[in-house]
């Protein structure tokens, strides 16, 4: 979304708000129509729910940073079907960025290929024993330097008992707007792609480094359990990954259009 230049600068606050609301509504509606086109069972009457977006502000111009968790030698979790978390995270993150870019939201990715980010800024000559710490620190540094207004970190879950399944969102306790963003993503997941999902959002503990050390609205989306055969089979499917990306993108768009997101 290009908000620069005299035409936009010369708008009064009310006009800017209307403009931003229109753009953010377009994002949400476009995403939901994409979901229908992909055949994920989103009923037409449900799409109308997303047309009513709260009055927006020019805060919907904020950069959204999408963080594909893990990467490179850090593969994250793995499934019995051979799926690696790092690969799925990157794939879904790229789809989210594509959807947001098409609709005019400035979306940036912490990584666009299969690598850790510990040496992104070349701070040390020797990262032995420090790779994971610097990888996480640099993801936050990237978001800060991008002047991000929101951070969405994409991950996969795994548990030693295979019966657990479903998407779940964790939110940073450091910004009041993290929780509404998490709630919207969780809500849309249940409505549009996981009707059986009864999980609730959770406040991130201090063990989740990125959620602990950021001050901007931030959520971590555990898209499913690689330890669950059903989830793993879905996550191996390209169409289902697109459904996840559309769900997250549409939820983020409606959140961006809310007046609370501007605070």
Where do the PLM segments sit?
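Catalytic-site microenvironment of enzymes
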Residues: 1-263
């Amino acid at each position: 979304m290009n908000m620069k230049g005299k035409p936009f600068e010369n708008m009064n606050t009310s006009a800017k708000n209307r403009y931003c609301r229109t753009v953010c509504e377009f994002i949400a509606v476009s995403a939901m129509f994409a979901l229908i086109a992909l055949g994920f069972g989103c009923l037409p009457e449900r799409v109308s729910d997303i047309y009513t977006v709260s009055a927006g502000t020019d805060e919907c111009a904020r950069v959204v940073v999408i963080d594909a968790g893990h990467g490179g030698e850090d593969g994250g979790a793995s499934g019995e079907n051979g799926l690696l978390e790092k690969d799925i995270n990157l794939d879904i993150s790229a789809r989210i960025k594509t959807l947001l870019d098409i609709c005019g939201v400035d979306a940036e990715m912490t990584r666009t290929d299969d690598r850790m980010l510990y040496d992104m800024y070349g701070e040390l000559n020797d990262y032995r024993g420090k790779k994971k710490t610097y990888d996480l620190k640099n993801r936050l540094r990237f978001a800060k330097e991008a002047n991000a207004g929101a951070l969405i970190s994409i991950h996969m879950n795994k548990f030693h008992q295979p019966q657990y399944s479903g998407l779940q969102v964790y939110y940073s306790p450091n910004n009041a707007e993290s929780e509404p963003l998490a709630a919207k993503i969780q809500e849309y997941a249940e409505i549009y792609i996981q009707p059986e999902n009864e999980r609730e959002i959770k406040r991130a503990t201090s063990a989740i480094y990125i959620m602990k050390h950021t001050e901007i609205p931030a959520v971590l989306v555990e898209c499913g359990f690689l330890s669950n055969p059903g989830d793993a089979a879905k996550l191996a499917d390209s169409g289902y990954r697109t459904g996840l990306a559309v769900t997250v993108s549409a939820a983020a768009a409606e959140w961006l259009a809310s007046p609370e997101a501007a605070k």
